[in-house]
Amino acid sequence: MILLQNLSGPLGWAVLGISLLVIFGLIVMLISWYKKVPQGKAIIRTGVGGTKVAIENGIIVVPGIQMYEVMDLSVRTIEISRMKEDGLICKDNIRADTKVVFFVRINKEVADIKKVAQSIGCQRASDTATLRELFEAKFSEAIKTVGKRFDFVELYDSREKFNSEIQNAIGLNLNGYILEDASIDYLEQTDISYLKENNILDAEGIKKITELTAQQKVK
């Protein structure tokens, strides 16, 4: 009873005021420490408490003992071209000029985001130049391997199958990234002027083109 009487006096109001001020200060502090995740991105927090990933909501970052970086999870494109002298060699040794666009992004799973952050870094993870370094050779090899399964005319008439088999050849193991889609942007026969007669494969291709052209003239 005495305590309640004391709190009802000037001292009580002072204690209440200080308490409210402290609570208000804590709320303001927590709000300033709260980092909301931008759309299409993730926040990776390091420091005390270990590595934490926020994808949809937000996360508290305490200055001085914790740090954070933002990682872009949006889709990036990588275009692989095989043109002219480097045209894709088909099963019948006819070359094809082709451009394939790959749509790649970081997988929206905590384990994959951590893997990419630790191995590549948040800032470089979605940089187009970095993605080319990581995947250009793999994607180019997939195009080359799959293209060799088709004769040129079959390849030209079966773009969807060509596309599907390229994606299957690349697979799902992209070390934290995923191949979301691919698109055959351009596909035409390589001009015969770029083929080399002293190249065995090109010589076979020239022979095949000559035969097909002759057949078309007869028709």
Language model features with spans:
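Aromatic-capped interface at the extracytoplasmic side
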Residues: 27-41
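Transmembrane alpha-helical segments that serve as helix-helix packing and pore/cofactor-lining elements
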Residues: 33-35, 73, 88-89
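Solvent-exposed beta-hairpin/edge-strand motifs
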Residues: 59-69
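Edge strands and adjacent loops of beta-rich recognition modules
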Residues: 68-82
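Elongated, amphipathic alpha-helices that form coiled-coils and helical stalk/scaffold elements used
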Residues: 79-219
